A protein has these predicted regions:
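N-terminal hydrophobic membrane-entry segments
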Residues: 1-182
């Protein structure tokens, strides 16, 4: 039996397992010097600071069957009293959050048209945050924010939008010219 000294920083907690079992009363240890008895006790560090996960660009199909690409960020942090769940309930919470966020984004975007997606960024952020927070709560995580970095329609949709804006400018110019000639 060897004593092992662990230094736990202010922003960390140490999940301690004695003979492979986590004890709710004594298993989660706070900041300071912590002595473990090896090989009977092992530990996992849990960082309590807010973390940002970049969700890679996702291709989604809107309700009106238009392709759209979205990049976004998820801000999350462990719930302090439930931090041990990050070790006990999920193997790799980063991958789990990315997978869940991708699925939730597809569901949200699939219910909207392209025009709604382009004009309602805040609503999309909030819908994803609320749904993701409900799911990650069982792992001891709190989703504090979701921020869409970029929304990019497929090239053919961008071309159609550019043609529409150009036609609108020409229409306004013709109306202005006709009003000028009438006077």
């Amino acid at each position: 039996m060897l004593p092992v000294i662990k230094i736990v920083r202010q922003y960390e907690r140490l999940a301690v397992f004695t003979l492979g079992k986590f004890h709710a009363r004594t298993g989660l240890r706070g900041p300071g010097l912590r002595i473990l008895i090896w090989p009977f006790q092992t530990s996992e560090r849990i960082d309590l600071r807010e973390e940002v996960i970049n969700i890679p660009r996702q291709s989604n199909i809107t309700r009106d069957n238009a392709a759209i690409h979205i990049d976004f960020l998820v801000y999350l942090r462990p719930i302090e009293g439930e931090a041990q769940k990050l070790v006990l309930e999920v193997v790799n919470y980063h991958q789990a959050v990315i997978g869940l966020a991708t699925t939730i984004l597809r569901a949200v975007i699939g219910e909207m048209t392209v025009d709604e997606v382009l004009s309602q960024r805040a609503r999309i952020n909030e819908q994803i945050r609320v749904t993701l927070d409900d799911e990650t709560g069982r792992w001891g995580m709190k989703v504090t924010a979701v921020e869409i970095k970029e929304i990019e329609p497929a090239q053919e949709i961008q071309d159609a939008m550019n043609r529409q804006m150009s036609a609108e400018r020409i229409r306004r110019a013709v109306v202005t010219e006709a009003e000028g000639k009438r006077e």
